[in-house]
Curated annotation (Swiss-Prot):
Residues 1-20 are annotated as: Disordered. It comes from Arabidopsis thaliana. This is Myb family transcription factor PHL12. The gene is PHL12. GO terms for molecular function: DNA binding; DNA-binding transcription factor activity. The lineage of its organism: Eukaryota, Viridiplantae, Streptophyta, Embryophyta, Tracheophyta. Signal peptide: none annotated. Residues 20-80 form the HTH myb-type domain.
């Protein structure tokens, strides 16, 4: 009875291998797994593919959703021996390629001629010299701009001082002229009270009349006669 369970039914047309158990188990051969991988890739990867779509794309008779569901889960988890083998193979290839690249680089370093090294050194020196010259030019331009700005500020300050000085001189001249006019005007202003009590020189000259000499003598004669009369009466 155990021997009957181990019997295998092979369908060469579809590549499907099933056991003769009451629940036949599918043997995933390399050819069948490759068809499965092609179908999954065609459907957009293991995350997008479903057992139903995989079965439709593969088109293998006798393949059930149960078989595909189990195999898809293992494929997603990365537990298939075929996938592990392919991954290991790709890792080995990458390691080999990496080692080959390292060897090529080492050989290139050791086999580099002194002429190439000297040329690289000359190019580096020329690049450094070029950058130094650019920095010198930039520094010179900055200094020129600073000097020009300083001269501009100095000229603006001088103009401001000249304008202020001219304004002060004009104000002083105007003030002096106004004071002179005020003094001249006040000297010619008449004072009513003074003129009322003190006549002017012209009026004083006209009213002041000196007496004649003859009148003075007559006045003296009258005074002397009066004095004589008084003495006679008293005697």
């Amino acid at each position: 009875m155990m021997q009957s369970r181990e019997e295998i039914r092979d369908d060469s047309s579809s590549g499907l291998v099933l056991t003769t158990d009451p629940k036949p188990r599918l043997r995933w051969t390399t050819e069948l797994h490759e068809r499965f991988v092609d179908a999954v890739t065609h459907l957009g990867g293991p995350e997008k593919a479903t057992p139903k779509t995989i079965m439709r794309v593969m088109g293998v008779k006798g393949l059930t959703l149960y078989h595909l569901k189990s195999h898809l889960q293992k494929f997603r988890l990365g537990k298939q021996p075929h996938k592990e083998h392919s991954q290991n193979h790709s890792i080995c290839i990458r390691d080999t390629n990496r080692a080959s690249m390292l060897d090529l680089r080492r050989n290139a370093v050791f086999t580099t001629s002194p002429l190439i090294i000297g040329r690289n050194m000359n190019e580096m020196q020329m690049e450094v010299q070029r950058r130094i010259e650019e920095e010198v030019v930039i520094e010179r331009q900055v200094n020129q701009r600073i000097a020009a700005q300083g001269k501009y500020m100095e000229s603006m300050l001088e103009k401001a001082c000249e304008t202020q000085e001219a304004s002060l001189t004009k104000d002083y001249s105007t003030l002096f002229f106004d004071r002179t006019n005020i003094c001249n005007n006040t000297s010619s202003i008449p004072i009513p009270w003074f003129e009322d009590h003190f006549p002017s020189s012209s009026s004083m000259d006209s009213t002041l009349i000196l007496p004649d000499i003859n009148s003075n003598f007559s006045l003296q004669d009258s005074r002397s006669s009066i004095t004589k009369g008084r003495t006679v009466c008293l005697g």
